[in-house]
A protein has these predicted regions:
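Beta-strand segments within the central parallel beta-sheet cores of soluble alpha/beta enzyme folds
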Residues: 20-30, 57-60, 135-139, 169-183
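Residue-level preference for non-acidic, small/hydrophobic
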Residues: 3-7, 153, 224
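Structured C-terminal helix/loop/strand segments within mature extracytoplasmic catalytic/sensor domains
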Residues: 158-291
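Conserved active-site and cofactor/substrate-binding residues in soluble primary-metabolism enzymes
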Residues: 5, 38, 86, 90, ...
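Internal, well-folded beta-alpha domain core
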Residues: 134-155, 159-169
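Active-site SXXK
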Residues: 1-16
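Inter-helical turn/loop segments and adjacent helix faces that build the functional surface
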Residues: 17, 102-110, 133, 160-171
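Active-site-adjacent helix/loop patches that line small-molecule binding or acyl-intermediate pockets
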Residues: 21-133
Length: 291
């Protein structure tokens, strides 16, 4: 969920300009993508530009996110690869920073690697926290993860959308991240995904980003607000139900967007006969739909 914050290092170090990255690569650095053909080819070409390959990624081999993409892969005689991992764009971003600054590529995912230390420094500034004693570990794709309270995470997302209290270079970097995410919603996630659909409908006004274990974040650029959600049992569908209702409650959903996102406000539950047998509904009194 914090990939857009981590990707600030790609801009601020000059690595993005040094390797002539476009909005597509910036968006992929922020993405939890489906591993569809478009995602895989773009990341592969990006790595080739660095003189690297999928073998240089520390994220493990994965299958594409969707059944449709998995079937297409198998029919083509393909197999799971590191390029299909939903975090491969983030890893390509870290490798780009390492190459640009002349740091070793090997071990780019280690907590003590200069790339990760730079990323942690940015995270400290954006969250307003000293993270030295914060809980630390490794996430599923092999990158350091740090425990941050939801309030500080929401502050970081608010600053991504409105970085007026940050240095000028940070403000420019935040703007570039926002533009890339808004310009390439498909690359952020993929066909039918919540993140992609919301960004397609609202653009830079509401940039949402999924995370693991029921974490979801958003920046509401025009409102200067950040959102950070954590569902206790890690359920993503619950996080999405809360996020869409928060966007509506905070006035971020235009009438046009509501029309496009109607089946996200109360997602239908289908039987195996494809009949609607229920809906996913947020029941919190301040977020529940009327009726």
């Amino acid at each position: 969920a914090i990939k857009p914050i981590q990707a600030l290092a790609l801009i601020e170090t000059g690595a993005a300009n040094g390797f002539h990255l476009a909005s597509a690569q910036i968006a992929l650095a922020c993405a939890s993508h489906n591993g569809a053909i478009t995602h895989v080819e773009l990341v592969a070409n990006w790595l080739a530009r660095l003189g690297l390959s999928a073998d240089d990624l520390v994220c493990g081999p994965s299958l594409p996110w969707t059944t449709e993409a998995q079937e297409a892969l198998f029919k083509a005689g393909g197999a799971a690869s590191r390029l299909h991992d939903n975090c491969s764009g983030k890893h390509a971003g870290f490798l780009t920073i390492a190459k640009h600054l002349g740091h070793p590529v090997q071990g780019y995912n280690r907590m003590d690697h200069p790339v990760q230390q730079r990323v942690i420094g940015i995270l400290e500034q954006m969250t307003g926290m000293d993270l030295h004693d914060a809980p630390k570990g490794m996430d599923g794709c092999g990158i350091p993860v740090i425990g941050v309270p939801l309030g500080n995470l929401a502050l970081a997302m608010a600053r991504l959308g409105d970085p007026h209290d940050q240095p000028e270079e940070r403000q420019k970097a935040c703007a570039r991240i926002r533009r890339a995410m808004a310009a390439e919603p498909y690359l952020i996630a993929g066909k039918g995904r919540f993140c992609t659909r919301v960004i397609e409908a609202l653009g830079e006004a509401a940039l949402v980003k999924t995370g693991a274990e029921g974490v979801y974040c958003a920046t509401l650029t025009g409102l200067g607000l950040g959102i950070a959600i954590k569902i206790d049992d890690g359920a993503q569908r619950a996080a999405e139900a809360v996020m869409i209702r928060l966007l509506d409650r905070l006035g971020a959903l235009t009438e046009s967007a509501k029309g496009r996102l109607l089946n996200l406000l109360e997602p239908p539950i289908f039987s195996r006969s494809n009949e609607v047998v229920g809906v996913i509904r947020c029941t919190h009194p301040e977020l529940a739909l009327p009726g």
